[in-house]
Amino acid sequence: MQADHRKSEIIREAYRLLRKGGLYGIHELGLTPDQLAEDKKAGIQQELAKCIKVNARPLTQSEWVHLLEQEGFRIIEINTNPMLLLETKRIIDDEGFLRSLKIGFNIITQPKARNQILKMREVFNRFKENMNAIAIVAEKV
């Protein structure tokens, strides 16, 4: 979840560090479909930036592929899943039951954090048809 210029810098650095044939894996926030209208894409990116207070700029699958190939990588595998980052089941799967209880306790007892989480969840739900999780494995050629 980086600004566009930072994505290229990070990918370039990964390319520099890897040996030929080395694998680079990313797991990012994505946009779907590939033909998503530019105004809709900009609106989603703007809403995300406001609610998570980071200049998050998710890309479509074809944009991720283009970015990686532009920096010298060959795509090996791409997987996508629905955006479930703030869903209870996903939190338990990611964090485990006890850690999820602690997160829940913090959300309940910290109004500022609760408001932030609720805003993020509202944005994720509003754009769930156009947001996904994307994982890409690429090889340095």
Give, region by region, the residue ranges found by the protein language model.
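Conserved Class I S-adenosyl-L-methionine
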Residues: E77-V141
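A short SAM/SAH-binding and catalytic strip from SAM-dependent methyltransferases
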Residues: M1-R6
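A short glycine-rich, Lys/Arg-flanked "PGG" loop and its adjoining helix->strand segment in the class I
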Residues: S8-L23
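Conserved class I S-adenosyl-L-methionine
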Residues: L23-L48
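Short N-proximal segments of mature Sec-exported proteins
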Residues: K50-I52
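A generic structural signal for ordered secondary structure
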Residues: Y15, G72-F73, E139-V141
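Short alpha-helix
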Residues: N55-I78
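Short, conserved clusters of charged catalytic residues that mark active-site
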Residues: E9, L59, K119
